């Protein structure tokens, strides 16, 4: 049986992509995708990893050592952060004002955590007063989880004062920046964010398939001190950290 006439080379039609993602990709990026492959432990590839980390730190506005590009979509970044920072029985306050706040609550449940939902109408944001009241009422709380820019509605969540509030209650701050990173400032260090993830196919205007991710030393401390290993081997950030470590670069994926 021959497939010569049945299947032809795929030539995609030209589209002007105007949605939140995937977005248009610069021709220079498309050209880079046509270059020969390198092995994942090739010295040139390892040097490229250093460059990627430096550029992502600038994009996230952070000095976090653990700043990487995770293999997977933005949802993989979401699941990696939740699976590593939320353990069974942990309480996590999650802002639910759209599709992705709802997804975060679901992932917290699947990790054995106890999501405390603060709901707002779709298109609205989560008031900081509601976060403060819930942090006091539900203590101890492991983390506050918020979507910076809710893709399903376009709502932009103010974050400037949330990090300090979380620290006052010994809670981590987890932020979904899938739609916002590269489009508006994401001030990870200034805002006191402990874990932040994004996706390459939105405002960064890259092909999908990578999840930029950064975790503060405080967040990495919580991961290293887990009561049990992360239930996901593939998304275990303690293992992935060793692959991105400047000194060891131990193979993981």
Task: Please identify what each model-predicted range represents.
Residues 103-114:
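Active-site-proximal loop->helix
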Residues 189-201:
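Conserved active-site segment immediately N-terminal to the catalytic lysine
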Residues 65-93, 97, 101-105:
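Conserved beta-loop-alpha segment that forms the PLP phosphate-binding cup at the N-terminus of a helix
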Residues 14-71, 75:
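A glycine-/small-polar-enriched, mobile loop at the entrance of the PLP active site in fold-type I
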Residues 126-182, 195, 203:
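Active-site phosphate-binding strand-loop segment of PLP-dependent enzymes
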Residues 17-19, 68-71, 94, 117-118, ...:
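General beta-strand structural signal in soluble alpha/beta enzymes
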Residues 24-25, 201-253:
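Active-site C-terminal subdomain of aminotransferase-like
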């Amino acid at each position: 049986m021959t497939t010569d006439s049945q299947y032809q080379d795929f030539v995609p039609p030209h589209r002007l992509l105007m949605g939140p993602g995937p977005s248009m990709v610069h021709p220079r990026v498309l050209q880079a995708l046509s270059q020969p492959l390198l092995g994942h432990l090739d010295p040139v590839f390892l040097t490229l990893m250093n460059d990627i980390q430096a550029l992502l730190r600038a994009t996230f506005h952070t000095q976090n050592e653990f700043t990487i590009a995770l293999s997977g979509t933005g949802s993989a970044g979401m699941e990696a952060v939740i699976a590593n920072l939320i353990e069974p029985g942990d309480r996590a306050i999650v802002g639910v004002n759209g599709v992705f706040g709802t997804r975060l609550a679901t992932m917290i449940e699947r990790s054995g955590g106890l999501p405390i939902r603060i709901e707002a109408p779709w298109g609205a944001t989560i008031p900081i007063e509601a976060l403060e009241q819930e942090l006091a009422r539900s203590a101890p709380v492991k983390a506050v989880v918020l979507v910076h820019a809710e893709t399903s509605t376009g709502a932009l969540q103010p974050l400037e004062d949330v990090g300090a509030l979380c620290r006052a209650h010994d809670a981590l701050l987890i932020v979904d920046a899938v739609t916002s990173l590269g489009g508006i400032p994401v001030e990870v260090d200034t805002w006191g964010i402990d874990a932040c993830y994004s996706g390459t196919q939105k405002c960064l205007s890259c092909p999908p398939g990578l999840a930029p991710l950064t975790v503060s030393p405080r967040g990495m401390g919580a991961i290293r001190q887990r009561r049990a290993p992360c239930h996901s081997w593939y998304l275990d950030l303690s293992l992935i950290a060793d692959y991105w470590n400047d000194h060891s670069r131990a193979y993981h994926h």
